[in-house]
């Protein structure tokens, strides 16, 4: 883990943890272990599809259990749909929720800048 902190003196650092908090990143380490070590605010990215609410809430619960700060949940909209995942998540959590879609980059960037 110390290799991740070596010579980092930037004002903004982004570390991607693919697969979820409890996905392995090494033989005896999970993404959550890296997150705990680095103590950076989390941006939880969830694909906007059926099951997104459950995935987001479970990840938020795991972050809370491990005393990790979550800056926001990002719903990644690959395809237009009639789901109301953003509205549902806003109702279930106090964590900010933003959406990202191919055509809405400027709006997304302005929302994210306020949160991180």
Where are these regions (language model features)?
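Anionic group-transfer/hydrolysis microenvironments
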Residues: 18-19, 49, 78
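Phosphate-binding/switch loop-helix module in NTP-utilizing enzymes
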Residues: 1-25, 32
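Short gly/pro/ser/thr-enriched loop/turn and capping motifs at secondary-structure boundaries
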Residues: 50-53, 106
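Inter-motif core of Ras-like GTPase G domains
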Residues: 26-49
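C-terminal lobe/tail of nucleotide-utilizing enzymes
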Residues: 61-116
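Charged helix-capping and loop-helix junction motifs
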Residues: 26-33, 57-60, 83-87
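Structural motif
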Residues: 14-16, 43-45, 74
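Short glycine/serine/threonine-rich phosphate/pyrophosphate-binding segments
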Residues: 23-25, 52-55
């Amino acid at each position: 883990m110390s290799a991740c902190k070596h010579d980092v003196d930037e004002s903004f650092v982004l570390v991607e943890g693919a697969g979820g908090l409890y996905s392995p990143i090494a033989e005896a380490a999970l993404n959550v272990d890296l997150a705990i070590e680095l103590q950076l605010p989390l941006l939880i990215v969830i694909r906007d599809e059926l099951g997104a609410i459950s995935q987001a809430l479970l990840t938020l619960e795991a972050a809370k259990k491990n005393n990790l700060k979550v800056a926001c949940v990002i719903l990644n909209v690959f395809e237009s749909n009639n789901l109301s995942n953003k509205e549902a998540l806003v109702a279930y959590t106090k964590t900010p929720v933003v959406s990202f879609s191919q055509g809405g980059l400027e709006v997304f960037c302005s929302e994210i800048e306020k949160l991180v």
